[in-house]
């Protein structure tokens, strides 16, 4: 799981529900923009909540899984990477909040990855409700 910006909610939902040890190999949160840039690079447009950023995150995280968990040692294991980059509603309630959520996953360990990418526009007017929505959405997407 890699969640940047205001979106550290999906991993929280998994940890809160229990059973995360059988699903989550790694949870990474980068709320700081400089730290995020150090991991994923700087986007040409200098924006963080974009489809391009999400796709870069997914590719990076899948590559890390494949580097760190050897296929020879786990020939039947299917891998996935979940990521989101989100901005929730601001304090002045001028910007309503939106984000990008995605998952790359295998349905067969010997084949490539499928991919789902979603763009969200939050309708809630409270940041906590937006975070809860994101956590539920991410959990259901992974399920």
Predicted regions span which residues?
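Non-catalytic terminal extensions that flank enzyme cores
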Residues: 1-143
């Amino acid at each position: 799981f890699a969640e940047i910006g205001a979106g550290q909610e999906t991993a929280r939902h998994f940890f809160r529900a229990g059973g995360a040890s059988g699903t989550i190999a790694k949870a990474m949160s980068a709320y700081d923009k400089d730290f995020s840039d150090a991991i994923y690079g700087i986007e040409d447009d200098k924006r963080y909540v974009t489809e391009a950023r999400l796709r870069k995150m997914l590719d990076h995280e899948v590559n890390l899984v494949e580097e760190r968990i050897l296929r020879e040692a786990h020939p039947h294991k299917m891998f996935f990477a979940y990521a989101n980059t989100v901005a929730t509603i601001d304090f002045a309630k001028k910007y309503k909040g939106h984000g990008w959520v995605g998952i790359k996953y295998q349905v067969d360990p010997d084949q490539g990855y499928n991919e789902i990418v979603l763009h969200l526009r939050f309708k809630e007017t409270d940041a906590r409700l937006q975070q809860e929505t994101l956590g539920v959405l991410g959990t259901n997407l992974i399920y």
